[in-house]
């Protein structure tokens, strides 16, 4: 009997560690399963979060682009002041010209600044990339008229006189005074007094009239 009890005790001592190891392994496996599930869920959440981040970034980029487009549209329509690097062109009549000094058959009025001169220079500034232009603080917009009646010049219906101060912001104006260009021709042939100054801080004021969109058309 004592021998049997001893054998049973030995067998029990051999079996108990196996049960303990199995229980520990089961706990480890369950913990690992919980961890794997939690990690998979975290990965899923991170992917969803990244989608939202990308969407927000895209929306911010789109909003920024639309804001820039709106600024350009407002500048073209003259709805706001525009300040930045630009140029100031000042034109004045040839004060030295007189009926007796001009070439025979020439017209003394050729030595004065006319609306065609203003139009030509404004167009050159536009072609150079200017985003905002004014003449004597009259903002140039798509519906602006520049005309002359006798010695009276009007811009946007307002009377303006010499010296004509044309301001422009934006663009590159390196070729404005090129040899053979319009400004060079006015200076050389008719002695029109013209100064061109580039400045880092030029302000073109907004249009101060009422914009009539009745005849406005979408550009093709």
Regions found by a protein language model. Name each.
Residues 1-220:
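Core subunits and conserved enzymes of cellular information-processing
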